[in-house]
């Protein structure tokens, strides 16, 4: 695994379609959610209203009157003023319309919960840019990009909705989010318990900070996914790195690698680390999107894509050339399952510049997640967690240095037992589950485990191929939400 790129590519799952210039250790600090394609169509057409709310740029200072328009979406087809509820999606690091169209669970349960659906865009993403074209100009303009400010936006928006929508004032609100959005949903319930009666935090790695979990747990889970999906699959990948290193020592070897991997551009010796990072990122992405049915994010993928990949990686005890030819076949499943791609492009691609820049700044300030590999418990080249290296890159890119302890100071780390009404769901296939809450903390801080689930599978729309484990998870989640709604109305009745 790359010396400084490992940490960053682990988080680089925001749609790669625009190239931007970022320092090496910042490039892959993309995001926690799945790769997104702005041109991809949702599985089911969604009907919603697009609205805007004027937010303060700084909720915590009193010497500025600067405001910006936060975008949010509302769908009220099934909402009932009597006995209804509001499901509030705490927006992630990206365009809110994509999250709206790809969080089918909320749409599926809206009628049952008599719910209005609200999807709130996170500041500094999508159209919710506090300083317009100057939003990413420098660290002074980015200074208000924090989870705390985003949570305050959500609180102000909920107050606005309850003030302005007849019938909404006395209804319970439930926060829902996935990945970073799931972290925000949990933190919102912790920090603003009077605003939401509960939270569903799907695939939310709230403990992937400091030393709360081992730094190698993420890549260990990725490796387990491949090991369980085919005999000798992970071992083939583990041996591929040395094969690449040996073949790249000569000009003829580089030429052979370029052809064998069907790359769009000739490899040079300076490209090898990037090549290995790109391959590693592919295996990580596959672990996140290992869904039980065909899906389409960056490109079409088959059902259970890791099993398909592992069909080509059954024998690690072959020559370097044959092993890497097999690696190409495996990569081709991810990058060219449709058969439309003529060559594989390892040149740097990331999300739209604004989205990637926003998240790389967050990863340089408060969202500091340690990652490492050792090549023994995982199938990657050894890489140690190096905070100083990250800090130096962040300072050169943004003029800021990370505060690795701030998230645990703000939100409590593992000391959260005083909070209530949060469901933490995690898929066992999802590498982010290593930093998630996977065991009940109290009777009201509940963990739901999905044995056949990848990254927030439970938030996706229902599918005929959904495994029993995700059906049970969704059923449990709805049951908890119904209990929160019932308790809210019971309490309101007693007060009158």
Swiss-Prot record:
GO terms for biological process: angiogenesis involved in wound healing; negative regulation of systemic arterial blood pressure; proteolysis; regulation of blood vessel endothelial cell migration. Pfam families: Peptidase_S28. GO terms for cellular component: lysosome. Residues 22-45 form a propeptide. Keywords: Carboxypeptidase, Disulfide bond, Glycoprotein, Hydrolase, Lysosome, Protease, Signal, Zymogen. It is an enzyme of class 3 (hydrolase). Residues 1-21 form the signal peptide. Its EC number is 3.4.16.2. Disulfide bonds join 215-372, 233-310, 264-343, 364-394. InterPro entries: AB_hydrolase_fold (IPR029058), Peptidase_S28 (IPR008758), Ser_carbopepase_S28_SKS (IPR042269). GO terms for molecular function: dipeptidyl-peptidase activity; serine-type carboxypeptidase activity. It is found in: Lysosome. It catalyses: Cleavage of a -Pro-|-Xaa bond to release a C-terminal amino acid. Residues 194-334 are annotated as: SKS domain. The active site is at residues 179, 430, 455. SUPFAM superfamilies: alpha/beta-Hydrolases. Homodimer. Cleaves C-terminal amino acids linked to proline in peptides such as angiotensin II, III and des-Arg9-bradykinin. This cleavage occurs at acidic pH, but enzymatic activity is retained with some substrates at neutral pH. PANTHER family: LYSOSOMAL PRO-X CARBOXYPEPTIDASE, PROTEASE S28 PRO-X CARBOXYPEPTIDASE-RELATED. This is Lysosomal Pro-X carboxypeptidase. It comes from Pongo abelii (Sumatran orangutan). The lineage of its organism: Eukaryota, Metazoa, Chordata, Craniata, Vertebrata.
